[in-house]
């Protein structure tokens, strides 16, 4: 019997076990192109797939890439840049050339110019000791700069294979789907290739007669909010369109709540400016710090707020702010641009979240 594979993740299609990769209801087996249930939910409902990838498997993947002479396409998330970095990437992929795709441009305000974003990404990579061949600012959702991406891949690969790397939720699937449309004859079946030392199947897209593009599996960043929220909350916290900055003037001993997911206390300082960049779904409230715990518990009972049952389950991080503006990033959730010279703040997030 010919194996049928999910055209989203490459898993072998089966309808026997809902908990195993590749599951689809029998009613879907007659379709010409089949997405497994997990890929279908991810594509249509923005629900995350359960990860079957271990850290050891992920490291083996990177080490295997490092042993090859190839072009690495590294996809990062502009909205959560630090949270989307693959730890120790350059240590594992050796001296291979790297093309960076800075995704999710559509989420950031239009007032941020593309060339400034490009320069900022290059500067951030330089601080991490990474010098990519090139950086392209893109939006998978809006098909932004994809012709430029395809041209640069063809320019930089020099006939070599291409490996796409990135953690989950950076938009890798959208990019791969566009690559499929650009390079593949839709009448041909997509092939997969098993990675040495793992049980992982990779989607393989032929680029020409001698080379291919491989989609490496992503891994969850355990320090991102997206790794701990329920599936129903994932679409709630992940922006689906351009974020609208919300500005608050805070005096000392005032607090801001970000639904039930995070809280900032302004503990000391003159009046400060707090500009918040979060999903439009996020309910953001300002209150006096002395009323903050009461407000949290009251709204928790109304199911307005999120995952932590009380503020005591969250960990507090204290910061003294500099004279200039400072961004406070809550990985996988959003960020706050604060201008409160020499002020002091306390940030509450669940333990383990950066």
Where do the language-model regions lie?
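Histidine-anchored nucleotide/phosphate-binding helix
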Residues: 84-97
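Conserved ATPase-coupling elements of RecA-like P-loop NTPase cores
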Residues: 83-86, 110-113, 223-226
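Core catalytic machinery and nucleic-acid-binding channels of phosphodiester-processing enzymes
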Residues: 73, 78, 85
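Conserved beta-strand elements of the Class I
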Residues: 71-74, 163
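Short acidic, S/G/P-rich loop/turn micro-motifs used as interaction or catalytic elements
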Residues: 78-82, 106-109
């Amino acid at each position: 019997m010919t194996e049928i594979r999910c055209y989203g993740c490459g898993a072998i299609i089966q309808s026997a076990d809902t908990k195993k990769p590749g599951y689809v209801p029998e009613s879907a087996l007659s379709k010409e192109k089949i997405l497994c249930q997990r890929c279908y939910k991810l594509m249509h409902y923005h629900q995350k797939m359960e990860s079957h990838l271990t850290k050891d498997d992920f490291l083996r993947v990177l080490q295997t890439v490092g042993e090859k002479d190839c072009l690495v396409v590294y996809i990062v998330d502009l909205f959560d840049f630090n949270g989307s970095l693959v730890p120790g990437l350059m240590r594992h992929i050796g001296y291979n050339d790297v093309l960076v795709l800075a995704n999710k441009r559509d989420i950031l305000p239009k007032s941020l110019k593309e060339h400034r974003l490009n320069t900022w990404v290059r500067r951030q990579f330089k601080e991490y000791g990474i010098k990519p061949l090139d950086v392209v600012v893109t939006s998978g959702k809006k098909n932004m700069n994809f012709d430029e991406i395809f041209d640069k891949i063809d320019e930089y690969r020099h006939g070599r294979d291409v490996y796409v790397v990135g953690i989950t939720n950076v938009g890798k699937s959208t990019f791969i789907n566009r690559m499929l449309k650009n390079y593949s004859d839709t009448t041909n079946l997509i092939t997969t290739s098993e990675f040495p030392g793992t049980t992982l199947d990779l989607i393989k897209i032929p680029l020409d007669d001698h080379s291919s593009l491989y989609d490496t599996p992503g891994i969850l960043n355990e320090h991102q909010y997206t790794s701990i929220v329920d599936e129903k909350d994932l679409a709630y916290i992940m922006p689906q369109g351009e974020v609208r900055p919300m500005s608050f003037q805070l005096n000392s001993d005032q607090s801001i709540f970000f639904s039930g997911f995070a809280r900032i206390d302004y503990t000391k300082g003159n009046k400060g400016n707090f500009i918040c960049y979060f999903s439009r779904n996020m309910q953001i409230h300002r209150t006096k710090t002395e009323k903050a715990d009461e407000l949290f518990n009251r709204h928790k009972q109304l199911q307005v707020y999120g995952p932590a049952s009380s503020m005591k389950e969250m960990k507090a991080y204290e910061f003294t702010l500099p004279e200039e503006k400072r961004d406070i990033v809550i990985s996988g959730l959003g960020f706050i641009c604060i201008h409160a010279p020499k002020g002091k703040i306390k940030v509450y997030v669940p333990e383990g979240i950066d």
